[in-house]
From Swiss-Prot:
The lineage of its organism: Bacteria, Pseudomonadati, Chlamydiota, Chlamydiia, Chlamydiales. This is Malate dehydrogenase. Catalyzes the reversible oxidation of malate to oxaloacetate. Its EC number is 1.1.1.37. Keywords: NAD, Oxidoreductase, Tricarboxylic acid cycle.
Length: 330
């Protein structure tokens, strides 16, 4: 019997004892991100003091007997977790507590992601791909990117896939079509209540969504704010933030990059340098992207903005710019 040689990727996951990581780790080890022909050298990191919880995560991963999980270590050393990695999933972040202003949250997480970026700069492979999940995600990603100048700025991504998935589902349900009939779902800007779920680009059964769903009032005043505020709605209903859906979205976001489908559009917060839409450089901004044969991505060019979308994009841009200014001295 001839054994097929597998490639191996070294992967770090932070916030390893949290809810999102708990769901994501099993998808990762199963092959949902890198495919069934790729073995994984997995490092799961969380803060000192969480060793016992990390050991429980390790037990469960071991007990799953995943064939693709070549090696596994749990650690409270960020340097150990990031040593020689090909990819990092930065999930851990400080949550917003009672009475905490957004500026306080930005400062606290700014310190966390400054450290993580600095460690990645020293320890990760130069071509490592970095996926940031911890909120406020665009600004956290920007901080990490700027603290890791030895890494390619184009390899930093902040997650907008959950917003894309939410919009995808709402459009499909409204049009009463299967999910795979909805394509070109685009989310611009910041992952916040000022994100821009752009229904004007979406297609339903190959036709513009605005033709299939002719009720513009529903698109602008029901669907649009529903996507913007979905995270808060989940917290209000469940008592906890999105976890399973966020983990699923993270796996899909990474898979779109590592195992792309021809012509697939995906929304991602990426470095805005030299973008085709006039967004200022040196931001992490949500754009529609697609993968190229070279393994790099491009921002999908030439998409028109109507007056409604253009105004909403400016609002989101203003928010990201203000967040950047508030942490730029970290």
């Amino acid at each position: 019997m001839i054994m097929k040689l597998m490639r191996t990727v070294s992967v770090a996951v932070t916030g390893g004892t949290g809810q999102i990581a708990y769901s994501f780790l099993f998808a990762l080890a199963h092959g949902d991100v890198f495919g069934s022909d790729c073995s994984i050298d997995l490092r799961v990191y969380d803060l000192p003091g969480l060793e016992r919880a990390l050991s429980g995560v390790r037990m469960e991963l071991d007990d799953c007997a995943y064939p693709l999980l070549q090696s596994l270590r749990v650690t409270t050393s960020l340097e150990d977790a990031c040593d020689g990695i090909d990819a990092a999933f930065l999930i851990g972040a400080a949550p917003r507590g009672p009475g905490m202003e957004r500026s306080d949250l930005l400062k606290r997480n700014g310190e966390i992601f400054s450290l993580q970026g600095s460690v990645l700069n020293v320890c990760a492979k130069r071509d490592a791909k970095i996926f940031v999940v911890g909120n406020p995600v665009n600004t956290n990603c920007w901080i990490a990117m700027n603290k890791a100048p030895k890494l390619n700025r184009r390899n930093f991504h902040s997650m907008l896939r959950l917003d894309q998935n939410r919009m995808h589902t709402m459009l499909a349900h409204r049009a009463e079509v299967p999910l795979d009939e909805v394509t070109n779902v685009v989310v611009w800007g910041n992952h916040s209540a000022k994100q821009v779920p752009d229904f004007t680009q979406a297609l339903i059964s190959g036709k513009p969504a605005v033709e299939v769903i002719s009720d513009r009032d529903w698109l602008e005043n029901i669907m649009f704010p529903s996507i913007q505020n979905r995270g808060s709605a989940v917290i209000e209903a469940r008592g906890k933030s999105s976890a399973g859906s966020a983990a699923r979205a993270l796996a899909e976001a990474a898979r779109s990059i590592f195992l792309p489908k021809d012509g697939e559009w995906f929304s991602s917060g990426v470095c805005s340098d030299y973008n085709p839409y006039g967004i200022p450089d040196d931001l992490i901004f949500g754009f529609p992207c697609r993968m190229l044969p070279s393994g790099d991505y491009e921002i999908v060019p030439g998409l028109p903005w109507d007056a409604f979308i253009k105004n909403k994009i400016q609002i989101s841009l203003d928010e990201i710019s203000q967040e950047k200014a508030s942490v730029s001295l970290l």
